[in-house]
Amino acid sequence: MSGCFPVSGLRCLSRDGRMAAQGAPRFLLTFDFDETIVDENSDDSIVRAAPGQRLPESLRATYREGFYNEYMQRVFKYLGEQGVRPRDLSAIYEAIPLSPGMSDLLQFVAKQGACFEVILISDANTFGVESSLRAAGHHSLFRRILSNPSGPDARGLLALRPFHTHSCARCPANMCKHKVLSDYLRERAHDGVHFERLFYVGDGANDFCPMGLLAGGDVAFPRRGYPMHRLIQEAQKAEPSSFRASVVPWETAADVRLHLQQVLKSC
């Protein structure tokens, strides 16, 4: 399938009841990065660049729950002080394996023409995410990569900054993915783009917060057995009517691809 067309050539309604613009993407497909696109936590992976492939206990002891970004700023600073340069970190990011079936899924999505608009929301960092995606040949698929800003500083060392501030009590201080996705949808609506359906592929606890934006007809793809999946199950059990989106757990990305294929067949 090289394109995506409504039945009988009719234009479809978006999720807010507006008529979808001709040629506009019909579906927004959002991916997490760590343990979703790639099969590791990239923040753990870069520890391989440290002396002895281990961080000192004095550094690890500085972590505070909810302030992981601040902790990772210290990790990058420490690595830089040990002589680790961005090119060394890039090599590590480039070598992180994709999750099983992920390359096929991303290739499938890329072949669907205007069906999908694809974005990535990650609490990792832009340098690492982009290094990984470029090495895998999938960077151009993503219209926007929304992650903590990072890049070489004036000394040539990798520096990390928080993505934004927010008032969500459930999320880390540097990123609320609900706010990130909400702001993106608002921006696209201002551009005249109104999506028919939202699809969200993730794994972590911070991927649960944006589930509040999903409505009937939308689909959450939590990685089976991971925190996002467990939180969805708890929410469904506590108040079944509160979670309106369909839930399709995945073990390999082939599970996501097969479901999206069925969605396109029903269009």
UniProtKB/Swiss-Prot annotation:
Enumerate the residues binding Mg(2+). 32, 34, 203
Task: Kindly state which reaction or reactions the protein catalyses.
Answer: phosphoethanolamine + H2O = ethanolamine + phosphate; phosphocholine + H2O = choline + phosphate
Where found, per UniProt?
Answer: Extracellular vesicle
Which E.C. number(s) belong to this protein? 3.1.3.75
| Effect seen on changing residue 203 to S | Abolishes phosphatase activity
GO cellular component terms attached to this protein's record: cytosol; extracellular matrix; extracellular membrane-bounded organelle
Q: Which cofactor does it need?
A: Mg(2+)
What keywords would UniProt list here? Hydrolase, Magnesium, Metal-binding, Mineral balance
Tissue expression from the record? Expressed at sites of mineralization in bone and cartilage. Highly expressed in osteoblast cell line SaOS-2 which produces a mineralized matrix, but not in MG-63 cell line, which do not mineralize.
Catalytic residues in the record = 32, 34
Which Gene Ontology terms describe the biological processes this protein takes part in? bone mineralization; bone mineralization involved in bone maturation; endochondral ossification; regulation of bone mineralization
- Matches recorded under SUPFAM superfamilies: HAD-like (SSF56784)
Q: Which family does it belong to?
A: Belongs to the HAD-like hydrolase superfamily. PHOSPHO family.
Tell me, in a sentence or two, what this protein's role is. Phosphatase that has a high activity toward phosphoethanolamine (PEA) and phosphocholine (PCho). Involved in the generation of inorganic phosphate for bone mineralization. Acts in a non-redundant manner with PHOSPHO1 in skeletal mineralization: while PHOSPHO1 mediates the initiation of hydroxyapatite crystallization in the matrix vesicles (MVs), ALPL/TNAP catalyzes the spread of hydroxyapatite crystallization in the extracellular matrix.
PANTHER family, per database record: PHOSPHATASE, ORPHAN 1, 2, PHOSPHOETHANOLAMINE_PHOSPHOCHOLINE PHOSPHATASE
NCBIfam families registered for this protein in UniProt? DKMTPPase-SF, HAD-SF-IB
Q: What is this protein called?
A: Phosphoethanolamine/phosphocholine phosphatase
Q: Which organism is it from?
A: Homo sapiens
